[in-house]
Amino acid sequence: MRKINLLDLETTNKIAAGEVIERPFSVVKELVENSIDAGAKNITIEIEDGGQKLIKIIDDGEGIYPIDIKNAFLPHATSKINSIEDIYKISTMGFRGEALASISSVSKTKLKSRVDSYNFGKEIYIEGGKIEYLKDTGCNVGTTIEVSDLFYNVPARLKFLKSARSDSSSISDIVNRFILAHPDISFNLINKGKQSIKSYGTGNLKDSIRCVYNKTISENLINFESHKDIISVYGFIGKPEISRKSRTNQSIFVNKRYVKSKFITAAVENAFKSFLTVNSYPFFVIFIDIFPEYIDVNVHPTKSEVKFKDERAMFKTIFDAVHGAIKGELKESFTNFFNKEDINIYDSEKSITEPIKLEKEEVQIPIDLNSNNKIDIFGNNINKLSNNTELLKNIGIKEKNTLENNNDFYTSKQNEIYYANKNDECLNSCNKDNYSKIEKSLQKDNKNPDTLYLNEHNTNSSSINIKENKPNNFYVDMKIIGQFNNTYILIEKDKELYIIDQHAAHEKVLFEKFKSEIENRYVISQILLSPVVIELSEDEFNIYEENKDIFKNSGFSVETFGEYTINIKEVPLILGKPNVENLFMDILYNLKNMKSKETSTIKYNAIATLACKSAVKANDNLKEEEIKKLIEDMLILNNPYTCPHGRPTMIKFTLKDLEKKFKRIQ
């Protein structure tokens, strides 16, 4: 074994510089952070050859006391902390005291600084870590530092530097992050003698965003904020129309420090998930202000990462703030259309003294009387049953809006018959003949054996209690113009034109219904006339085995049929008549691409998304009643604005928008 050597100061400084100073932009970052800590309000950055030849920082901060000028370049010399405990309550950008020592050891560095209480300043020049001179000088209050010939004495590092253009771009990027993090500071970047970036320090974050990006982005932002006991989350997120195919327009600041965090990015993107199309990434500038003792910034040499004490709580806070803001913005955009005050949801007890005359109203019953499923019917007086169904006296009928995906685009409202009086006698007192008559009457309509029709012959009861969703003013000022290409529904309401993608809207309604059924463990399955046998590869079969409970809870009845063969006997009723094999393989492939740690909720959502996509039909010609039903079902959703894949379900044109298009107004 070789002898252990103690490295000299010059060597250790160069090694340390390799960690702290990766490229010229690292020098800019460290020096600008020092200026910010010094309370500067105007910071100028000058660079030449991408910072490889020259980096010059001028600030109007507090400056450095003459007695401290020399000490500032010693390793681990800092004014930010005094003990190890201070590391866990840091409120400054820098704290290690490594930057100046590292930079000066691999470059030629000149620094001039003056504090307000002195009439003159001090100037120091260091070359390769060695002090060449220290003298008095005349200068303004603040600090000016020049770093030239970076890595001149470390040829190995010079070989790995990128082009001047690439380094200039990296410096521009970090300056832009500073502009976003500190709207109250004016930054000026000069590249080769020409002004490249300029901010004005107005203190307005939107002004900073406009300076860094452009007018279009600054006009398509959604503000959000959330304040808890130890944390505040706030900032701006971009509307879906300014999303990008990469994450370059995403900025995270923790206590004003620009950081990169996968879990914070995941929280924002998950909040955005249902509002964006696949492979699109949202624009956002997010600020997290938290007590310093709840984070650790000393986990990376460049301080570009932080750790939180409670990442789960942080994730939820960020998710809720962003998701709520997006939902609120979309809701506000369609306020006139989705005005829930127009839909009067109430319990109406109607006292009817004469027969009700109804035009063949469909009541969808989600059970089959031939099965063992139970239907609970209670009444005070059970009278004779006519050839059709006789409404039982004092029976309560509670309507419940749902969607059933049968051969028609929509079926009528599902009704649930419930207790009108808990003390009433059970219908079991009826004899079996009565049950037989009920069953026959329910099956009279051959088109749908599960549909109960009420007409004027079966409403002789004196009183009916009905709980219903009934449009109040919703349709009064709404005009259904029609369909375009059997795909888009055109609606006029309150002098605004709404265009609804009927398939995206239908898919969203089905998705929410199916997801709700899965969550409530109430997925209705349909038995296939001919079971579908699928041969799987060993890998595919293993994925199925890992997720068979997911399939079961989603309404699939699957049995093993041989070594790597499965037999599908039942599928969710909501699917209608799907291509079972293709759907199953799509779901299996989707689960395969998921990480094993993904929660069952995410897997259920993936299944629901694929299932509903297969259930939506294309190019359907809808009647006015079907359009109204679709709108009613959209109205009760929490988020009717996007389909499960993130595409919008509708767009809106105001009269002003159209007049602008036709050049009637400017």
Swiss-Prot record:
PROSITE patterns: DNA_MISMATCH_REPAIR_1. The keyword DNA damage applies. One of its GO terms (biological process) is mismatch repair. InterPro entries: DNA_mismatch_repair_CS (IPR014762), DNA_mismatch_repair_MutL (IPR020667), DNA_mismatch_S5_2-like (IPR013507), HATPase_C_sf (IPR036890), MutL/Mlh/PMS (IPR002099), MutL/Mlh/Pms-like (IPR038973), MutL_C (IPR014790), MutL_C_dimsub (IPR042120). One of its GO terms (molecular function) is ATP-dependent DNA damage sensor activity. Keywords: DNA damage, DNA repair. GO terms for cellular component: mismatch repair complex. The keyword Membrane does not apply. This protein is involved in the repair of mismatches in DNA. It is required for dam-dependent methyl-directed DNA mismatch repair. May act as a 'molecular matchmaker', a protein that promotes the formation of a stable complex between two or more DNA-binding proteins in an ATP-dependent manner without itself being part of a final effector complex. NCBIfam families: mutl. Belongs to the DNA mismatch repair MutL/HexB family. This is DNA mismatch repair protein MutL. It comes from Clostridium botulinum (strain Langeland / NCTC 10281 / Type F).
